[in-house]
Every structure is written in C-alpha cells, then in structure tokens.
From Swiss-Prot:
PROSITE patterns: KH_TYPE_2 (PS50823), RIBOSOMAL_S3 (PS00548). GO terms for biological process: translation. InterPro entries: KH_dom, KH_dom-like_a/b, KH_dom_type_2, KH_sf_prok-type, Ribosomal_S3_C_sf, Ribosomal_uS3_bac-typ, Ribosomal_uS3_C, Ribosomal_uS3_CS. This is Small ribosomal subunit protein uS3. Residues 38-106 form the KH type-2 domain. GO terms for cellular component: cytosolic small ribosomal subunit. Residues 212-298 are annotated as: Disordered. One of its GO terms (molecular function) is rRNA binding. It comes from the Bacteria. The gene is rpsC. CDD domains: KH-II_30S_S3. It comes from Saccharopolyspora erythraea (strain ATCC 11635 / DSM 40517 / JCM 4748 / NBRC 13426 / NCIMB 8594 / NRRL 2338). Disulfide bonds: none annotated. The keyword rRNA-binding applies. Pfam families: KH_2, Ribosomal_S3_C.
C-alpha cells in the first residue's frame, strides 16, 4: 500500500495538512475546479521560478494564495510588477479579492518537488538520467535534515525503443510508516524522445503526535574542554589529611577527626609553640633543689 500510493494522500490528516483549506456545501465542485485552474495558471510561464507548492485558503469574500518558491525575485518581479500581474489575473479568474503571499523555500535541496524539477530540467538539456539522479541524491544528502532519498525516472530512458523505469536510493525511506515525514514530488521532463516522469521521495525523520522530532544534527557535539556550561565545583577549604582514616576535611569517622585534630594541634607556629611551652612550664609542679649540706652528705 505505502509503495504505491501518494505519500501526501496516505498521511493526510495524520502527519500532513491539506494544501487547500476552505469549506463549501453546494459549491464544492466549483471550488475544486477553481483551485486546479489557479495552480495551472501559476505554473504556466513560471518554470524558472522553482515553485514548490501553492496553498489556497478561502473566506467569504477573499482568497488567500501562498506561493512557496525557491526564487522569490522571479515571482515578485521588478518593483513588484510580476506579483501585481499575477494578483490581477487571479482576481479575474476567481471574481474575488486575492491576497498573494510569496514565501521563500530556505533549503531547496531538501524539497522533493524542487529536486524533481531540477532532475527534469537536466533531462530536458540532454544530460544522462543516471548522472542527473546521482547528482540530485548527493546534493540532497548533504542537508542535515535529510535521512534518505529515492529518485525514480520512467519513460524512454536514453532514447530506448521500449520505456522502462529506474530508481536510485540512498539512506532509509520507510514509505509504509505513517509517522515518517515523507516529502514527495513529481515532474515531467519534455525530451525529443517523449516525456520522462521524475518522482522523488525524501525522508526527513519521524513525526510524533503531529510534531517533528527535530534531531539537531547540525549542532555538532563540542570537543572536550569546550562543552557547555556546567555547575562549578563548590569551593573547598584547605585540604587536611587525617592520618587514622585517610579522609580529608571535617568528614570521615570519629577516629579520623580525632587524628586530624591531633595533627592540627601538633602543627603549630613557633610563636604558638613558645607560648604553649611557657604555659606548660608554669603549670608544671615545682621540685625543690637539694641544699648544699645535703649534697655533701650524699
């Protein structure tokens, strides 16, 4: 199932959103046909603009059109002349006020539709299809958010009499996993041998609860010595080693603390030692010296 169906339609409402957002009761078919006409008119004559997708949102009296493009300068034109022309054409088509928003695609190498357009453009310029596919894969895999890509070309490849399809894949592309963020793009290349279809699948990681599990691969882990800020060590006092238990400071066993106090007492300055000696001599009992006559008798 996942190998055949369009990845956007397969995951619609689960991990992907609609490209047309509006509600209609009796005018549903008219709005669908109008959306198709809007997208066709924007694609006609704008091949070099690199349009990735067109989102349409309707209200009662206004139509908002968001154009996602890799080259916004081509869509806007000089002093906004091209944008004004597009807006007037769409207002004439819909009969309503059109709000035109032109959004730039930041990473064109990770957009499946733009990759498919790039491969198709090379095929139209008579570049070998294998070379074009491999070049697209290499450029896409350089992007940190791309985990896998698959590119497929079908038609009279190389001018062969019988049409066939070939694909190249690099990385992981789980088409049947609903939580997988799969971007899909399709474009047709017009060659002298006929049309060649180009399909591109790009895997960008997994989505959990509709939100992307962003794996920050661009944030390279800093080397040792340059890591993020850590909590500083608590300031320690002078390290005192206890002879009995081998502990330092005020911690340790009672024997260790007693030995530490003993060693502390033994390590005294000369002034303290002299003072303590005077105190000890003052407190010592006095012994009477023998008299001279007792010495002679002895």
């Amino acid at each position: 199932m996942g190998q055949k169906i369009n990845p956007h339609g397969f995951r619609l409402g689960i991990t992907t959103d609609w490209k047309s957002r509006w509600y209609a009761d009796k005018q549903y078919s008219e709005y669908v046909a109008e959306d198709v006409k809007i997208r066709r008119r924007l694609s006609r004559g704008m091949e070099r603009a690199g349009i990735s997708k067109v989102e349409i949102e309707r209200t009662r009296e206004r139509v908002r059109v968001d154009i996602h493009t890799a080259r916004p300068g081509i869509v806007i034109g000089r002093r906004g002349a091209e944008a004004d022309r597009i807006r007037g054409s769409l207002e004439k088509l819909t009969g309503k006020q059109v709000q035109l928003n032109i959004l730039e695609v930041k990473n064109a190498e990770a957009d499946a539709q733009l990759v498919a357009q790039g491969v198709a453009e090379q095929l139209s310029n008579r570049v070998s299809f294998r070379r074009a596919m491999r070049k697209a894969i290499q450029s896409a895999m350089r992007s940190p958010q791309v985990k896998g890509i698959r590119v497929q070309c079908g038609g009279r490849l190389g001018g062969a009499e019988m049409s066939r399809s070939e694909f190249y894949r690099e990385g992981r592309v789980p088409l049947h996993t609903l939580r997988a963020d799969i971007d899909y793009g399709f474009f047709e290349a017009r060659t002298t041998f006929g049309r060649i279809g180009v399909k591109v699948w790009i895997y960008k990681g997994e989505l959990v609860g509709g939100l992307k599990q962003k794996q920050q691969e661009s944030e390279v882990r800093p080397p040792r010595g340059e890591r993020g800020e850590r909590g500083g060590r608590p300031e320690r006092g002078g390290r005192r080693r206890s002879g009995a238990s081998g502990t330092t400071g005020s911690g340790g066993t009672e024997a260790g603390r007693a030995a530490a106090d003993k060693s502390k007492g033994s390590a005294q300055s000369p002034e303290q030692a002299q003072t303590s000696g005077d105190v000890a001599s003052a407190n010592a009992p006095q012994v009477a010296e023998p008299r001279a006559d007792e010495k002679t008798e002895g």
